[in-house]
Amino acid sequence: MAVITMKSLLEAGVHFGHQVKRLDPRMKRFIFSERNEIHILDLQKTLQGIKDSYELVQSVIKNGKKVLFVGTKKQASEIIEQEAKRSEMPYVNNRWLGGMLSNFNTIKKSVQKLKKLEKMEVDGTFEMISKKEVSQINREKLKLAKNLTGIKDMEELPGAIFIIDPKREQIVINEARKLGITIIAVVDTNCNPDVIDCPIPGNDDAIRSVALFTKIISDAILESDKEVGIQIVENLNEEDLMSEIEVKNERKES
């Protein structure tokens, strides 16, 4: 059973939002306070978002669907790949190709081409062609693999998408909404939570925060067949929480 504590969220810097001037007004309901011109997120609402997303993910998996992990920013890329592989789910961590969802049949053809090129590498084809041809094939294979490796085994549209930084991944959200695919996302203070089916208020820039959220989603998938839920331990009251919150240089503003 996954156990989440208020202290673990604080240690990961989950509560740190962006500078006050970067607030999306639609995020106001998730704001706890303000410190040194930095917004502090309400961790009670973060915990609720975690609980809701955990249950939603397990429901998707039990219905025989997959969860697509998406995070293309530098802080998220490696974590997204690692946790998606751990839970044997598809992922996109380099660049979202327009139409990955809305034009899925065309994308599948590109995936089939990638698989064909990979097969040529091991079935003896390379021994029968020139070095120049091998070089050309390898270049094409690497180009396709860069963006498609994570979805090679995604035979149909996912039941849900988990996104790190929905503000960055607007194309993903637009495609998913048009197709009615459930969207779960970590929403920072500069995001629009209204386009997300299951928003999780949190820091989407700090690596520890991104890792914590992504691991929770992966754990939910892995435990979906065990009828195991998530345990929330709220071991800090509001007074303790306020004393713990000290904004130093936890966030690099761009």
From Swiss-Prot:
SUPFAM superfamilies in UniProt: Ribosomal protein S2
Q: Does the keyword Ribosomal protein apply?
A: yes
Give UniProt keywords alphabetically. Ribonucleoprotein, Ribosomal protein
- Molecular function, one GO term: structural constituent of ribosome
Q: Which GO terms describe its biological process?
A: translation
GO CC annotations, alphabetized: cytosolic small ribosomal subunit
Query: What superkingdom does the record give?
Result: Bacteria
Which family does the record assign?
Answer: Belongs to the universal ribosomal protein uS2 family.
Protein name according to UniProt: Small ribosomal subunit protein uS2
Origin species, per record, is Borrelia recurrentis (strain A1)
